[in-house]
Amino acid sequence: MEVKYVTVGALTKYIKRKFDVDPHLRDLWVKGEISNFKQHSRGHMYFTLKDSQGRIAAVMFAGYNQHLPFRPEDGMNVLARGEISVYEPNGNYQLYVKEMQPEGVGSLYLAYEQLKQRLEAEGLFSPVHKKPLPAFPRCIGVVTSPTGAAVRDIMTTIRRRYPLAKVILFPALVQGDGAAPSIVRAIERANSFGGVDVLIVGRGGGSIEELWAFNEEIVARAIFASKIPIISAVGHETDFTIADFVADLRAPTPTAAAEMAAPHVGELAERLAERKWRLIRAMKEQLAADKEQLRRLQGSYAFRYPKRLYEQKEQQLDALLERLSRQRERLVDKHRQRLHELDMRLWRHHPAAELERMKERQKAAANALEKAMRTAVERHRFRFRSNLARLEALSPLRIMERGYSLVYNEQGELVKRTNQLRIGEHLSIQVQDGRVDCQVTGVEEKHV
């Protein structure tokens, strides 16, 4: 009997088709806790959803997760929407997630808190980075929608308070898709425009979704990177956006931002009037003090007898002139003596004098050399004679003059002992005036 079978691959494909055609598994929300979360280098997210009764593998591809407003983490309870299917290579079923949000907490709020903590840790909110606002700006830039109420409020407030300032609008989207990049581009244009002293970035009020562009990371980093001081004005009294934390100054409304950026001409006039009054009062007080001092000086001894002021100084001047004259004479004598010394040194170093001295030294050296040579010759002559006398005293010829002779054997060797001789051996005897040949007839050894 032939057994019917299916291959593993065919069975897996069959089960996968069952999952794929089941309407209950094509689009569903799954609640669970994230564990084993990993994000691939290509952006895909892999994790497990679990509860007390089970677990299921899940994947969220980069095309879906790039728009997530929060960062998934292990231990986070979420609601995940997607479809169930089978991953054929290992036969496991898993949830293919297309949408996800935190359970119990709005995803926007979670994203806000996560970004806030991260940027604060990087130091973007630190007071050390806050730039001061100019006291009297000549040009005020505004980044907002050109059609909203915020731009009208800002323009009206600045013209009313400080008409001396020029206002430049850098239009941008302030809500919806593309709002955050639009705000970033407007801030960058304001920085590259040149001449903008302070920048207001904001919009009128709205829901958190409408204001969300001001919570985007790219907007926060553009505000932080701005060289121009920025006032955030996102039209809400109580809540803060990320832009508020990064900006150099936060205003609760666009109107308040305009008031912070532009001083009031009336207030300036009052301050100028007050300073003018204070200056006049100070000048009057100083003038009165100077008059009183002049009155006291006019009644003083010096003003009554003015000659006494310079009589003593004249005497001191005479003494100083006398000291100066003596000092000048000493200085002239000193330089005269110095000139004489230099003249003597110059004479000593004159070429003729130097040549004469060199001739004297050469003559003295020649005499000394001649004397030394004579002494050396005499010394060597004496040594030669002494050595010659010693050599003559040691010469064999001198010895033979005293009766001695030299005896040589047949081999021509000098005979010094009797043991060198044999009977019948011929000898040669060298005397002072010649040689004698003889033969040994007997040898007698002398014992000492």
UniProtKB/Swiss-Prot annotation:
Q: Cellular location of this protein?
A: Cytoplasm
Q: Which reaction does it catalyse?
A: Exonucleolytic cleavage in either 5'- to 3'- or 3'- to 5'-direction to yield nucleoside 5'-phosphates
Q: Name one GO molecular function term.
A: nucleic acid binding
EC no. given is: 3.1.11.6
State the name under which the record lists this protein: Exodeoxyribonuclease 7 large subunit
Signal peptide boundaries? none
- One GO CC term, this protein: exodeoxyribonuclease VII complex
**Which Pfam families does UniProt cross-reference here?**
Exonuc_VII_L (PF02601), tRNA_anti_2 (PF13742)
Upper lineage is: Bacteria, Bacillati, Bacillota, Bacilli, Bacillales
Assembly state and interactors?
Heterooligomer composed of large and small subunits.
Q: Gene name on record?
A: xseA
Kindly state which keywords UniProt assigns to this record, in alphabetical order: Cytoplasm, Exonuclease, Hydrolase, Nuclease
A GO BP term here is: DNA catabolic process
Q: What does this protein do?
A: Bidirectionally degrades single-stranded DNA into large acid-insoluble oligonucleotides, which are then degraded further into small acid-soluble oligonucleotides.
Primary enzyme class? hydrolase
Q: Which family does it belong to?
A: Belongs to the XseA family.
